Regions:
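Active-site/catalytic core of tyrosine-dependent DNA strand-transfer enzymes
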Residues: 201-256, 260-261, 265
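Short, basic (Lys/Arg/His-rich) helix/loop patches that form interaction surfaces
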Residues: 241-288, 292-296, 307-309
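Basic, Lys/Arg- and aromatic-enriched nucleic-acid-binding interface segment
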Residues: 126-158
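Flexible interdomain linker/hinge and immediately adjacent N-terminus
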Residues: 69, 73, 101-130
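Conserved tyrosine-mediated DNA breakage-rejoining catalytic core shared by Y-recombinases
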Residues: 160-208
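DNA breakage-rejoining catalytic core of tyrosine-based enzymes
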Residues: 79, 114-131, 185, 194-205, ...
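N-terminal DNA-binding module of tyrosine recombinases/phage integrases
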Residues: 1-37
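Non-catalytic DNA-binding core/recognition domains of DNA-processing enzymes
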Residues: 29-103
Length: 309
């Protein structure tokens, strides 16, 4: 329902921009508010449609300068970069062009200190992930949902098998406490680093969506020079890495990589779903779910960012 409403509002925004600010084929002049490319019109319409949806508006005419200003501040607080904030501001001002007070105040982006990626908390908030997905196609969206829901590496999306098609590696002792605290889901097998096969749990509704993408016959693709026989029409490996990078930079202005989805999974598990276990027990469960088996590596996803570390 929300996607339909956002599409409707985006279409309305595109018509508004074409009717009032269409500068395609016209000479550019200093101070002109006209938009001179179809791509810019499409992008600003997308931004307007998302803003109106986030503000729960049924019509663009209901947008007020105060609401637009508050939304700008909200985007700043989410971590959007200065360039993207400026684009949002210009887009919303075009919707408000008939208002007497249609000039929005510039919002300054939060300062971002440049530190090595290895020292950063690479986790995305759920809101940031939803925001990133607005700039993705349906295939990339579903792949992103699966990755964060099951804590997968990008290449593991290419190895998903049903439990009657593969089994977890017998060289490891698997805890029966894995997936404790998770809601109902479907277990699958993925192959991770060094060929380790492990069970992962995908939420029931997401698994049902994924099964609609199952291929009639396995298909071989090449990712980073390695062949993968895929059973589902998903985006994985370098293709998902690249798609996630583009969407994250476009919406947030920065990117911690699709691997940050594993940080999100780990911190959600420890902070929200494994609270009935001791820290040591929770770390053991999580290490097996992530396919690491080494506590020092698992802690990299948590300390000092998790509430329990």
């Amino acid at each position: 329902m929300k996607n339909k409403q956002q599409k409707k509002l985006t279409d309305l925004a595109e018509r508004l921009l074409k009717n009032n600010f269409n500068g395609i084929g016209k000479p550019k002049t200093k101070g002109s508010l006209l938009l001179h490319s179809r791509r810019t019109i499409k992008e600003q319409a997308r931004i307007i449609g998302k803003a109106a949806t986030d503000l729960n508006l049924k019509n663009l005419k209901l947008l007020t300068p105060t609401m637009a200003q508050d939304y700008l501040t909200h985007c700043r607080d989410k971590g959007c970069c200065q360039k993207y904030l400026s684009t949002i501001k210009c887009s919303l001002q075009r919707v408000l062009f008939k208002h007497e007070n249609n000039k929005l105040t510039r919002v300054i982006a939060l300062e971002r200190k440049e530190i090595p990626l290895t020292d950063k908390n690479r986790a995305y908030t759920n809101e940031q992930i939803r925001f990133i997905m607005t700039a993705m196609n349906d295939r990339a969206k579903l792949s992103t949902l699966i990755a964060v829901d099951a804590g997968l590496r990008v290449e593991e999306l290419l190895t998903i098998r049903r439990t009657n098609e593969a089994s977890a590696s017998k060289s490891r002792k698997w805890s029966d406490l894995r997936f404790s605290g998770r809601k109902e889901g479907v277990r699958y097998i993925v192959t991770g680093k060094n060929g380790l096969r492990r069970e992962v749990l995908i939420s029931k509704d997401i698994a049902e969506l994924m099964e609609t993408k199952r291929l009639v016959q396995p298909k071989t693709i090449i990712d980073r020079g390695h062949p993968f026989a895929i059973n589902y029409d998903l985006l994985g490996g370098k293709r998902l890495t690249d798609a996630f990078y583009r969407a994250s930079k476009k919406t947030l202005g920065w990117n911690h990589g699709a691997h940050g989805l594993r940080f999100t999974y780990a911190q959600n598990r420890i902070d929200k779903e494994l609270t009935n276990f001791t820290e040591s027990e929770a770390n053991l469960i999580l290490s097996q779910e992530l396919g690491h088996f080494r506590e020092e590596i698992t802690k990299r996803y948590l300390a000092p960012y998790s509430k329990r570390h």
